[in-house]
């Protein structure tokens, strides 16, 4: 710890002794809290400034928990290159924007047209995958469109570089990214025969067209072309099967609604639910002043979502399938962008 800070804190504790009992106890608690906060800040700064120790600890943990050779793990980590742009991008996520600014990023006429073309060019594959997993072809197309612009988004980062940078130089989410780094090192197999430094993806370490994190690759990636390996960069059957399996695994309900624009009564009850869990029957929402132009069972579970649109607040009634989309990205803005893009793709594909 900086010696000036240490001296100032000690002098402050001595000064506490000049106050009365009650005030002295209050100030003691306050200074103890501030000291703990300072120590924690210094510890985090030291961890980011000296990742070597953290890397060694990580290597020992991989050896202890997974049987990997610690020296081999360190050798792989040392192949990584620190990328400041990863940290910079992590600190300004698109999901921080309001809906009126977020939607135009993903739901564009170009992306709709490309999605409709992707749907038509791969209809047999998408219908086969959709039938296998119960997921609409246009939803698979929309996910691929949002995540990688149908493969046109450059995979600028080596996944190893991104994950090592975030695991050891980004304290706010170091625990999560170290777990993903661990998964990356455990992925290598006959079905996924790639060295960690060969894999390319996003600034967050998400891989291929569907932008799967290593843990998602391990759990949900599937082979779709019977060639004996999973390729999320070049094999459309593998890419589409993996997306379809992901949604099935999280409980996609075939044929069920996703979201409906709400009609709001003048005397509607103010309602701002936390999260996307559909906890209200449609009948309850209707009694509170929120209805949708659709014939659905009044007992259907749903919830209400408020978005900041171009013309003011937008209210949407969302269902279980909307929540399932959020398993891909927890932001409700993301789920709505995917849903609206999928609807637009389907409409464009049907157009003469």
Question: Where do the model's predicted regions map?
Answer:
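Acidic helix-start/capping segments at beta-turn-to-alpha-helix junctions
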Residues: 73-95, 144-148, 158-161, 261-269
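An acidic, Gly/Ser/Thr/Pro-rich helix-cap/linker signature
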Residues: 46-121, 127-130
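Bacterial N-terminal signal peptides
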Residues: 28-40
């Amino acid at each position: 710890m900086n010696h000036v800070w240490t001296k100032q804190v000690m002098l402050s504790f001595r000064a506490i002794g000049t106050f009365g009992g009650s005030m002295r106890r209050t100030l003691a608690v306050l200074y103890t809290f501030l000291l703990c906060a300072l120590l924690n800040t210094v510890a985090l700064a030291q961890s980011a400034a000296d990742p070597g120790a953290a890397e060694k600890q990580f290597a020992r943990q991989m050896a202890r928990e997974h049987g990997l050779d610690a020296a081999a793990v360190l050798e792989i980590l040392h192949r990584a290159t620190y990328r400041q742009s990863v940290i910079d991008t992590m600190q300004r996520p698109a999901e921080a924007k309001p809906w009126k600014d977020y939607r135009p990023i993903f739901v564009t006429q170009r992306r709709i047209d490309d999605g409709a073309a992707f749907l038509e060019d791969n209809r047999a594959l998408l219908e086969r995958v959709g039938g296998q997993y119960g997921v609409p072809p246009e939803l698979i197309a929309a996910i691929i469109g949002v995540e990688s612009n149908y493969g046109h988004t450059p995979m600028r980062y080596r996944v190893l570089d991104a994950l090592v940078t975030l695991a050891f130089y980004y304290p706010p989410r170091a625990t999560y990214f170290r777990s993903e780094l661990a998964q990356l090192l455990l992925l290598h197999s006959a079905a996924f025969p790639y060295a960690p430094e060969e894999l390319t993806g996003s600034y967050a370490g998400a891989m291929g067209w569907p932008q799967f994190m290593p843990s998602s690759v391990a759990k949900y990636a599937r082979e779709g072309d019977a060639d004996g390996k999973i390729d999320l960069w070049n094999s459309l059957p593998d890419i589409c099967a993996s997306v379809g399996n992901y949604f099935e695994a999280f409980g996609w309900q075939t044929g069920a609604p996703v979201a409906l624009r709400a009609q709001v009564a003048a005397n509607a009850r103010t309602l701002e639910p936390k999260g996307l869990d559909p906890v209200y029957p449609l009948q309850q929402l209707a009694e509170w002043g929120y209805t949708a132009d659709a014939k659905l069972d009044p007992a259907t579970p749903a919830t209400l979502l408020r978005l900041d649109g171009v013309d003011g607040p937008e209210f949407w009634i969302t269902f279980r399938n909307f929540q399932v989309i959020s398993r891909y990205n927890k932001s409700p803005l993301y789920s709505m962008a995917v849903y609206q893009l999928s609807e637009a793709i389907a409409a464009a594909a049907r157009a003469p």
